[in-house]
């Protein structure tokens, strides 16, 4: 979505809001894989009340993916696939002194997979805003729809922490650590080996 510019040269949207629409196309040779993606994103800053951002996505994938099997064997070398994924993400952030706390909710669905997510994070500014400490966690509650079987659950938990330091106007140094755990159905339906 593009900002509307009235005849007087101003914009109809406040400078604290931003919206955009994007399209991506990935196409491999021999029609092996084709991925089309549409994204609608927005961000609005409400001053002391915090800020809100969102994203809607629609991905379509078609083609064939290698299974890991040897060519000419009993198992097929390629697995044909066609799927559409729709997802939405919303996040609210609020500044509390030197802390910026954010909560993010997400949901996406495709033919054989549903994902529900919750993320919480905090960024602390120190040293006249030259140093930022960040930490947070991410929880995913997924459902995998397995052909000829009951739906399977998959859960993921990630914790991250990091620090960034402004050295000068052209240099920022950062270090980050992420630790993740997965539980439940972890199989890939497109691999046979």
Residues of each region from the PLM?
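Short glycine/proline- and aromatic-enriched beta-strand/turn motifs that initiate or cap beta-hairpins
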Residues: 8-46, 50-53
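Transmembrane beta-strands of outer-membrane beta-barrel pores
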Residues: 23-29, 58-62, 96-98, 107-111, ...
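Hydrophobic, lipid-facing positions within transmembrane beta-strands of outer-membrane proteins
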Residues: 36-40, 86-90, 116-120, 155-161
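Transmembrane beta-barrel domains of outer membrane proteins
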Residues: 43-45, 91-95, 123-125, 160-168, ...
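Solenoidal tandem-repeat scaffolds enriched in leucines and small polar residues
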Residues: 141-193
